[in-house]
Amino acid sequence: MARVGELERKTGETFVRVRLEVDGEGRADVSTGVGFLDHLLHLLAHHSGMDLEVRAEGDTWVDDHHTVEDTGLVLGRALDQALGDRSDLVRFADASVPLIEALSTAAVDLGGRSHLTCNTGPLPEKIGTFDTELFPEFLRAFTQYGRFTLHLNCHYGHNAHHKVESGVKALAVALRAAVSRRSSGTASTKGVVD
């Protein structure tokens, strides 16, 4: 059975539509109106092996906050929908990914409990036109509505773009491993994953 999540959300601030296929080929068709977010979503799809379609429209004349956060929210819900009851998942995984001088590690638990620890170290206020304070906001919404735990640590790096990009790549590689199917049993001593 295909592991697919597809949904949309419309509010007075945003309209977001996401289709996510867990067992994809890493294809991305993304347009959010926020260039750096599009870049990060392309990276997430490519390195996780998931196929991702995202369309978002938001009140970016105010700022990018609502669009970025709501994209994370709908993406999380789509992942949650695609993973079903999670009983056959490997569940836990981690990955360290370098990008030139930057190194990040992501550890994930797809066991149904939402938590985010995000340590990027100091970042400038912006990467291009992207407000860097929105990066953890995106991750917070993604983990909360995707019902998973993420510990993301950027160990070091001088270039803010490299630090954030290595973090997203590490998350993607960890997700790729964690969504793999177990050959038998459930990744919980309780017998259920919740």
UniProtKB/Swiss-Prot annotation:
Look up keyword Cell cycle and say if it applies: no
EC number(s) given by UniProt:
4.2.1.19
Annotated localization: Cytoplasm
- Tell me which UniProt keywords the record has, alphabetically: Amino-acid biosynthesis, Cytoplasm, Histidine biosynthesis, Lyase
Q: Name one Pfam family in it.
A: IGPD
Q: Main location per UniProt? A: cytoplasm
The answer to keyword Electron transport applying to this record is: no
* Superkingdom of this protein's organism: Bacteria
Query: Which catalytic reaction applies to this protein?
Result: D-erythro-1-(imidazol-4-yl)glycerol 3-phosphate = 3-(imidazol-4-yl)-2-oxopropyl phosphate + H2O
Which biological process annotations from GO are given for this protein? L-histidine biosynthetic process
**GO CC terms, sorted:** cytoplasm
Q: Which family does it belong to?
A: Belongs to the imidazoleglycerol-phosphate dehydratase family.
Task: State what protein this is by name.
Answer: Imidazoleglycerol-phosphate dehydratase
Q: Which organism is it from?
A: Rubrobacter xylanophilus (strain DSM 9941 / JCM 11954 / NBRC 16129 / PRD-1)
